[in-house]
Structure formats: C-alpha cells, structure tokens
Amino acid sequence: EDDGRLIVEQVPSLVITLFTREQFSYRIEIQLPDKPFSNLNLYTASSDLHCCAVSGYMVNIKCKSGSADIERLSCSGTLGIDCDSGKINMYIDEFSGGSLVNSTGTVNIDFAKDADTVISQGTRCYINGLAAVSDGRAAEDDDLAVTSPSGRVRINTNIKR
C-alpha cells in the first residue's frame, strides 16, 4: 500500500493474485527480493502488473486481461506463460525450458541468449522479426513451446544492450 507498490520479503514460495474490477485500471509495482523463489506464481486480471526483476526455479505468469511487464526474468527451472486477452512484455536473461500459451492477447519476449523455440501447428509467431511456423517437431524439456491460435507472439533472441 505504498502508492501502488507491493514489497515482498524473502519467502520460499509465493502466489500473487491481482484481481480488479474491469472498469478500473490499476498499476501495481511489485518489488521482489534478490534471492530466487523456489516457486513463484503471478496472476493478473484487469490490472497492470510491473516487476523489475523476477527470479525463481518455477515461475508461472498468467495474464487474463490487463498487462504484465517484467523487466528481467531469471528462471532456472520451468517457466509457464499464459496470456488470455491481455498483454505481456518481458526480458528473459536465464531460461531452461517451458511453455507459452496465448489465446487472443499479445506477448513480446526478448531473450538475452539464443533460445530454442518450438511452435505448434496453427500458431502465429514472429521470431527476430520474421514470421515463423511449425516445423512439426515436438518440444523437449529445454525448449520454449509456443501455442497461439489467434493472438500475436513476438520473440527476439538477441542480446539486449
């Protein structure tokens, strides 16, 4: 309750759920501790979430509506990203595998390093500015599996300067 800021002290596992009424728009900034979480879940609905840094072994981000902006994400385990009709922007500096499901929203991801992306059938996705389609292979543990039937996904695998 500090002008829309939520400051979280170190805990091993955390679930943050933000639900607001649709006619109101809230911007909530979350300051997380420097040490990584073993399990971190960030869920937003009809609100705007902004995080400077997120670090954890298992990180799940779900954006039903509204937006989620994450300036730096480090995930040493499994990453789960689920966007319904909202917008997610994030920069990922550590990644070891996971999935991205986007229904009708917009997802923009910048990777610090090259990341192997596996696209499912019927998905619209742009990788490094070029339209990408499924090559028919199955995702492995260290891949980012992307499913987006009618939303927009943009992925850059360039080093952020």
Q: What are these model-derived regions, one by one?
A:
Residues 15-35:
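Extended Gly/Ser/Thr-rich low-complexity repeat segments
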Residues 1-7, 138-139:
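Short, ordered beta-strand-loop transition motifs
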Residues 10-12, 34, 46, 55, ...:
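A mature extracytoplasmic/lumenal domain signature
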Residues 2-3, 45, 64, 84, ...:
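Structural motif
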Residues 70-161:
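Short, surface-exposed interaction patches in beta-rich subdomains
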Residues 4-16:
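Generic recognition of long tandem-repeat/solenoid scaffolds
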Residues 40-84:
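Right-handed parallel beta-helix
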